[in-house]
Amino acid sequence: MKKNKLKYVVIPAFAAAALFPVLANDNQVKANDDKAVSSSNISKPESTNGKSASALNTNNANETTPTSSLNLNNDVKPTPIESDEVVKPKVPFTIAEYKQKSALELAQLIREKKVTSTELVDLAYKVIAEENPKLNAVLTTENGKIPKALVDEAYRTAKEIDNRISAGKLAANPVDWKAQPFLGVPTLIKGLDELKNGDYTKGVYLNKGKIADKSGPVATEFAKLGFVILGQTNTPELGTRNITDSKLFGPAGNPWDPSRNTGGSSGGSAGAVASGMVPIASGSDAGGSIRIPSSWTGLIGLKPTGHVVKFPLVKTIEDAKAYFEKTGLIEPKTFIEPPKDLKKLKIAYTLKTPLKDLELSEVAKKAILQTVDFLRKEGFTVEEVKEFPIDGYEGIKTYTVGAIGEEGYVTAVKGVTEENKRQLDPATYALGTSSYMGPNANTDISSVKPLSTFIDQMNAFYKKYDLFLVPTNAVTAPSNDKKIDPYVDPEVEEQLYNINKITDPKERFKLLTKQWLPMTRRSPYTWVFNLSGNPAISLPTYLSDKNLPFGVMFAAKNNSEKILLEIGQYFQDKHQFKMNPAIRSTNVSENGNKIGINEDGTKFEYAVPTYAPSVAELPTLDINNGTATIPSKSENSKTTSVKEEKKVLNTNKLNSISKTLPNTGESTNNFLSAIGLSFLALIGLLKRKKNN
């Protein structure tokens, strides 16, 4: 019987942090794991004219502080609890309460008219003004302010929402809470996505001052769901790194320790949520860009099915479920429903990495073993596998071929000279320069495994197991001091800037693959599930002895997002999450409500709403016999049995979600990218034909 042929797509080397996480050499990764420097070492890079290069330069006077009555320079810091007395929330709504609540909780308060969207926008801008100078999570102009056009639009949107709610059914555009579950909630958009009147440099220094004239798919979708967009978040250049730092924007400080990085490439969004600026912020993931920073900042990070995807960083599973249910950025498809009893799921875990010579840090091992112990005590079946299913070194080669000819790199190096080439990230310059030579000019492409190899390997693994548990990263968050934690080896960096002088194609390709290794050794797992397309979720379950958050990751077969979200719900309900106490209290009252803290130290109690999907009766799936009870199907949410999974995996090949790169919005259908992947596709088809 002939096998189904799988499509091939370009996997951009950027767009996620990370296609390939990069650091120093192998010894540095372990030795520097718990080193950090003082926050005074975090500074925005200087441009050639001596001015800060990290700021968004709008080239006009179109910038201001938020137009609210709040004093944005007034420090508000919670004091220690002095009493066990629980009191009602203070009026007006406080910063401490705002930071504690999820997006759905804030939307519920708006719906109940206990607070207005405008008041929440006031509070959000105040927290940004307080936290951003030390974290550099939000993009600002050269004098440290969010562009006036974005601030004005945020207040205009919030006021319009308040008026609609006040008018009720008499409003010209009455509120539909089912369609807009996040109505009035402040948020931030990742800096690589287009936001009208916002930064459109993609972190490239040579693009400094470029402003978007329209909003892209992510900002449009967030507005459709009811969010009020306040501004944009920091990212690395073109999203290439697994940390957030660039010559234009500078490093992002981690709220747990500002001398450390948040991770990348959605690091600014992670810092914004983890510090309480907003309860939710957009992210994108082509190699770990959602999950890596979620792990290092103590958040929840879901990567849906697909190679290149978009999803927000959140602090509650309910917010993730609501977004997953309502977003139009996830293509409607057949999703596998979780079993009625989650303990029927068979879980595998490993302490081995895709890079077979890489040893995990003690923190990573402890995080996994603690999770395994918890699951077994809860009655789950958990088995250890002694070898990772995919060869990471082979996978890196495939990723590199996809990166050569990628449009983002090609565009970035246009017009670059010997004099200004070092204003680009060395990876950007090397991959962009190599793109003009074409993939075949850089390596013998027949020696690179096609994408289908890794998809088939993981599909085989999931025939035996339902979930795969691994550390999200190999180590804790790196330092922002590049002398301690460089993300590219200095010797390799120099070679990358002179790659045009390397005449041997094989040597060029070897250099391009080598430059990823320091990053992949820090984050060896995340990008594998982009390669295979499998969904995965990072959960904030562990704190190191230095009080640094560390996430564990569950991956599953394609279209198992609902199973991953229910596993996350189980961990959340069992109080396994370790988050910044300022944004999510772990204290629970006798009646199950959360307990927060006001600025004066008094406590307040609040209930956590449960998000209910639009489908009233969710189907149940018996994993053991592969049968399902299927109710009437909604448009966007279907169900399937295990017996149908093979058909699902074959029909759900590479869907339209990978036609647009989430970090740049660039089309992958360009000529240079097509050359490299055409060769890979041809090789894959020939090999399959030979085996039939």
Question: Which sequence ranges carry the predicted segments?
Answer:
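Bacterial N-terminal signal peptides that target proteins for export
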Residues: K3-V9, N669-F671
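Sec-dependent N-terminal signal peptides
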Residues: K7-A15, I675
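Low-complexity, acidic Ser/Thr/Pro-rich repeat tracts that form intrinsically disordered stalk/linker regions
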Residues: A24-V91, E617, T629, K633-N655
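Amidase signature
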Residues: E63-W177, K326-S523, L531, D573-G601, ...
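Gly/Ser-rich catalytic/binding loops embedded in alpha/beta enzyme cores
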Residues: K90, T94-I280
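Paired acidic/hydrophobic, glycine-rich loop segments that form the ligand-binding mouth/hinge
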Residues: I229-L230, P279-G283, F468-V470, I537-S538
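Fold-level recognition of mixed alpha/beta catalytic cores in primary-metabolism enzymes, strongest
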Residues: G271-A348, N558
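A cross-kingdom C-terminal cell-surface attachment/processing module
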Residues: K647-T651, N655-K690
